Amino acid sequence: MSLNVAIIDDHPLVLEGLKSLLIQTEGIENICTAQSGLQLNDLMTLHSFHLYIIDLDLPDIDGFELIHQIKQKSPEAKIIISTMHEEIWIVNKLKHPDIDAVVFKSSAGEYIQKALQTVLKGKKYYCPQFQKLYKEKDKIGHTPDTL
């Protein structure tokens, strides 16, 4: 299967790093990058993507809103979140049916590869630090759970 992938992050270094990791992945045909929701919308008029790697903090749109927009246009698309946010209330929001994988930016590059492989098999993936925080969230108290 040849995949089209979109990476959305407002930091060029992160975009380049993720792209260089994905180039090594068999089956990926096309990788496009965007630094904003607007740039992604422009790309989506030219390409259809199977997989999106999304940062939650973008200059022009909330990452959760962007996920909603993508899923409305492409319900079958896979979503991997790449975020620096490890706050409990965000961790809770990330456990959502529309999100297929979560990899913290503090994680090693191997975890984005594991996320990609797992998601393409139709399963969910959460990096080890996410799993740890998610298990601990109930000890800390109630957190918002809506997207």
Label the model's feature ranges.
Residues 9, 55-56, 83:
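Active-site residues of response regulator receiver
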Residues 76-86:
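A short, hydrophobic beta-strand element within the central beta-sheet of small alpha/beta folds
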Residues 2-14, 18-22, 52:
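Conserved acidic segment of CheY-like receiver
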Residues 36, 62-65:
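Acidic catalytic/metal-coordinating carboxylates
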Residues 27-35, 43:
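Short hydrophobic/Thr-rich beta-strand motif most characteristic of the beta2 strand and flanking loop
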Residues 59:
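The feature encodes the CheY-like receiver
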